[in-house]
Amino acid sequence: MTREEIYQQCVEKIAKTNALMVELATGTGKTKISLDLVNYLINSKWYEDRKELNILILVAKRVHKQTWQAEIDKWGGIHHPTAKINVRMECYESMHKCADKLYDVAIFDEVHHVGSESRLETLKALRCGYIIGLSATIPRKLKQYFKYNYHAETVTCDIVEAIENEILPEPQILLFPLMLDNRNPTEWLEINAKEKGPIVRGTYKDLWKYKKSKQHAMLACTQRQKAIEYDKLIEWFKKQYMLRHSEPMKQSWLFQAGKRLEYLADCKLGIVTDILYKLANERTITFCKTIEQAESVGKYCIHSQNAKADEMYNSFNQKKINHITAVNILNENANLVDCKYAIFCNYSSSEVCMPQRIGRSLRHKSPIIIFPYYQGTREEEILKKAIEGFNKDSIKVIHSIQEI
C-alpha cells in the first residue's frame, strides 16, 4: 500500500465505526494520516452546523506535546469553516482530567500506553465521538479490547510491507555474532544475598557448596557461567508461575529476564565502543538498556534523567553533533535527521519496543542497522524474530568490526 492507499483505507473503515486503530510502521506517516482523518471527520455533514469542536490528543510524555504541535503546524492545522477548534493535549497519566467534557475526536498517540488496567478503567469515563489509536505495534489483547468494547476497525502496515511498497527505505542489516567468554573468571555471581553474616568469596566450582550452606557468597565466574545461572533462575520462576499462577512469581520471572538482557548488554559495551570508534565520522544512534550503559559508550546521552536531553536531540538533528545514545526516550515520536547507522547494544522482548527502534533507524535514505548479539542466548531469539520477513539479500553476517 502507498500512503494514499493507507489513508483511503482508514477513511473507508472509520465510516463503519467510531473507533479506528492505525497500526503503521514507524516512519510511514501516522501523525499526518491522523490529522487528515480529523479534518475529514469534522468537515463531514454531521458537524456542519457546529460552532465549537473539541479535539483531544493523548500522548505518552510531556515532550511529545511539542512534537504534536509542530506536526499540526507543519501539516496546515485542524480547520473547520465556521467552528472554533479547541485542541487539548494531555499525557496518559492525566487521562482522568479529560472526563470533564465531550470530545468530538480523540487521538490516542502510541495507544499501547493505554493498555494497563487502571488506564482502561479511566478510558471508560471519557466521552469521545471518534477514537483514533496510533502505534507501530498494538498488543493483541489491546486490539481485542477496542474491538469488543468500541467495535474498532484496524488498518495495518508493518515495517516489511512498508519497505516492499517503498514507503520506507530498505536497510542493510549487519549481524555481528559474538560468544560469551567461558575461560576467564571476570564476573561475580552473588549467592544467598538475603542471608545475614559476612560475605564469603569463592569460585563457581563451589556453587552448590555455598548454596547448601546458605552463606552469602560472591563467586568468581565466567560470562557464560553467569548467563547460564540467569537462564536457570528465569526458568525456575517461569515454572513456578505456570504451576501456581502467582503474580509475585510472574513479576520475579519478568524482572530477572530484564536483568539478563541488561547483563548481556553490559558484556558487549567494549564491542559497541569499538564500533562507534570505527564510525567516528558517521552519524549514529546507539540503543542502550540503562543510563549507565548509555553514558559508558557515548558523550551525548538522551534519557529521562538528563536535563539537556532535548538540547542534544535538537543538536543532533541540526547536525551539530553526530553521535547520540538513547535509553527508551527515543523509541517514540522522534524524527532523526540523516542518521545512517543504528547500533543495538541491547534487545527487548517487548512486542512494541523492537519494531519501534528498527523503524526509528529507517530515517536515512540508505540506513544501516548493526546487531551485535551473543549466540545461544535470549538475544539471538529476539533478533531472529525481529528480522524475520526482511529481504535476505539485505542481511549480512560479519565477524569483525573491520567488515563494517
Predicted regions and their residues:
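Conserved segment of the helicase C-terminal RecA-like domain
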Residues: 360-389
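Post-DEXD/H (motif II) to motif III coupling segment of the RecA-like Helicase ATP-binding lobe
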Residues: 113-172
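Conserved Walker A/P-loop ATP-binding site and its immediately adjacent core
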Residues: 26-40, 49-72, 118, 291-292
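Conserved helicase ATPase core of P-loop NTP-dependent helicases/translocases
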Residues: 66, 283-287, 292-334
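Interdomain linker/hinge connecting the two RecA-like lobes of the SF2 helicase core
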Residues: 18-21, 159-283, 288-289
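Inter-Walker segment of RecA-like/P-loop motor cores
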Residues: 58-102
